[in-house]
Amino acid sequence: GKKRDGQALTTEEIRYVVDGYTRGEIPDYQMSAMLMAIYFRGMDRRETLDLTMAVMHGGETLDLSGVSGVKADKHSTGGVGDKTSLVLVPMVASLGVKMAKMSGRGLGHTGGTLDKLESIPGFNINLPMERFLENVDRVGMVIAGQTANLDPADKKLYALRDVTGTVPSIPLIVSSIMSKKLAAGADVIVLDVKCGDGSFMKTLDDARELATEMVEIGKMAGRKTVAVITDMDEPLGHAVGNALEVREAIATLRGEHKSELLELCLTLGACILTQAGLAADDAAARAMLEQTIADGSALKKLAEFVAAQDGDPAAIYDPALLPAAPVQMEVPSPASGYVRHIAATDVGLVSMRLGGGRATKDSTIDYGVGIVLHKKVDEPVAAGESLATIHAADEAAARKAVAELTACYTITPDAPPAAPFIKAIIR
């Protein structure tokens, strides 16, 4: 009742509620009332930090103290075609920054990094803790499933937020994301906050509020924290799928593929290097990161990482070894003009229906299917020119996807106003 009446909760009260709920001593109906009160009344920063720490202490934490060097972690608020980790992590790992990631699987319109990695023949995401820590120390990077039970409190709270309609609350989002990031043990945390159609925060103001809150909570908890706000009014890069996204990541690391994906990785990477004290400023950091592509060290690191997790490193040098879909079909543009908008969420759902994602937790994935976009926002297109290529398991699925994908594109006679991809950096 205290929060309902608009009062702040004490540290002890917050801890009592989170612990009690996690242990099953506080029933769902009481916790639902608390979530509704937080949703309507909000929380101040001290309460948000207390909530974050209480949720974090509800699970195990990852002890990286035995790992030498600077440890960094990146979190993305999600997005379609988001293969950032596959490019960014090898780049910074080749420069000596250690990155240990425990990832989730994809559900719905966003693909999980683990599913993308599992499209590489032999790749193993299930590592015992000992090997997880040994790999991050020796290779400099590890991306695996949840070895430790880092977030039992968050899982339980999230499920309840989902059914009570309290997902879009800043203190609840911040405590959910930051409890996991703090539990993951890194010194430097960089947050990739998406804003726009394909994301959770539809406006720049909302994204800025969320990013600022997360950065402040990270700093209060003693971590170097930065957030980058990026536009998500279209999928990131060109590929959406699993093996197709791995192919795009490889092409980017080979320097063959320039897109906003590379720009994002350079920006996030520069934040990590400057925060870690490995570069004097963003310009120096970007030069170091570009060098890892030019000299092949980032690609080599990706292959080393794949081999260290039982995957076939040859697939990194010869992407023809990755799974491929038997049917490819072009999506002709219905009109001439400029691409104004690509509905990211809908593109993700097209990929999911092709078999590239999960509608439910138990769905199986077809690693070869997906979509490769040829025309992105701002680009001119002629009627009949290919907007994208559908990669499908059979002709019928491909034809259905062609119609669905055509509907994802908005084409206008005039060029749209150019909007910057990177909206803001919050330090």
Regions found by a protein language model. Name each.
Residues 70-93, 97-109:
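Glycine/serine-rich anion-binding loops at beta->alpha junctions
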Residues 1-81, 301-308, 312, 422, ...:
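Acidic, glycine/proline-rich low-complexity segments that act as flexible tails and inter-domain linkers
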Residues 138-186:
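Phosphate/diphosphate-binding glycine-rich loops and adjacent basic-rich segments that engage nucleotide
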Residues 85, 103, 110-115, 146-147, ...:
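Short acidic, glycine/serine/threonine-rich loops at helix termini
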Residues 10, 166-169, 173, 183, ...:
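Well-ordered secondary-structure scaffolds
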Residues 102, 136, 144-146, 177, ...:
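Short beta-strand segments
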Residues 116-142, 212-218, 222:
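A glycine-rich helix N-cap at a beta->alpha junction
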Residues 40, 87-99, 180-185, 220-221, ...:
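Alpha-helix C-terminal capping segments
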